[in-house]
C-alpha cells in the first residue's frame, strides 16, 4: 500500500502562546479606605483615584498601586479586602479621632505574602488626604536599604515620633510591629509613655526613634496644618520650594472647596 506524504499545519487560532510571568513590582504603594462610624471625614473612591493619579504622575519607575478597602466600588486601581482584625478598636486618645490599628497587620509576612508582595520588597503606605507636589523618587531612594522609614517629627513629650500618614517598610523585616501588638495592653503602654494616636502611637512607642525618617526641612514632607496653613504663610497661594508631599493630618482636607480657595495650588496637583 502506497501512502502519500501528508503535511499537517496548525491553524493560527489553535497555536499556543506562552506568556512569561511578569516580575513583581519593586515597590507597592498602598492606600486605605474604610468606613469608621462616628468619624468626621468620609473617604471616597474619588479620593483613591486621585491618589493613584498623583503616584503615576510623580513616580515614573515600575510600581504597583493597591487600595486595601471594605468597599472597592468605583476604585480604578487594584484592591484587596480589608481584614476584620481590630475593626472595633478605637483611638484611646478619643473616640472621635481616627483609629488606624487595622493597618498594623500589613507588617505581618502572612499578609504581605497574600498580597503577593515578596519578602524584602518595598511597601509605601500613604494616607488619602495628601497632596503630592513633585517627583518622589528621592524619598524612596534616600533610605532604600532601611527596614522601616516614617514621617518623622518631634513630639510634645518625646524627641522622636512617627506620623502614620506616610511610612515605608520592607516586607518581612519588621514583623514585630504586628506580632508584639496586643490591643488589650499595647495602646495603654504607648499612652503611658506619652506616645499618642492609634497605630502611630504604637509605631512611635515601639521604634523609640531608632528608625530613620523624612522631615519637613530636609525632605519636603510637610503638614498643611503645622507648616502650610494660610494663616501661617506670607502668601497662601505658593508652596515652599522644597515641598514634595503635603499631609492634611487635621480637620482640613485637600478636596474641600474652602481649603482649595485658600490654597489654589492644591488643584494643580490634587487631580485625576
At which residue positions do the language-model features occur?
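GT-A fold catalytic core of metal-dependent nucleotide-sugar glycosyltransferases
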Residues: 73, 81, 85, 99-161, ...
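N-terminal anchoring/stem segment of glycosyltransferases
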Residues: 3-92, 114, 171, 271
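Short, flexible/disordered intra-domain loops and linkers
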Residues: 36-46, 92-97, 190-194, 258-260
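A short, glycine-/small-residue-rich helix N-cap motif at loop->alpha-helix starts
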Residues: 86-90, 95-102, 198
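Catalytic core and acceptor-binding pocket of nucleotide-sugar-dependent glycosyltransferases
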Residues: 171, 175-272
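Short, hydrophobic beta-strand segments that form beta-sheet elements in well-ordered domains
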Residues: 61-70, 124-126, 130, 148-150, ...
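Extracellular/periplasmic catalytic domains that process cell-envelope and extracellular macromolecules
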Residues: 22-23, 159-161, 237-241
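Short, solvent-exposed loop/turn segments at secondary-structure junctions
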Residues: 34-37, 71-74, 84-88, 130-132, ...
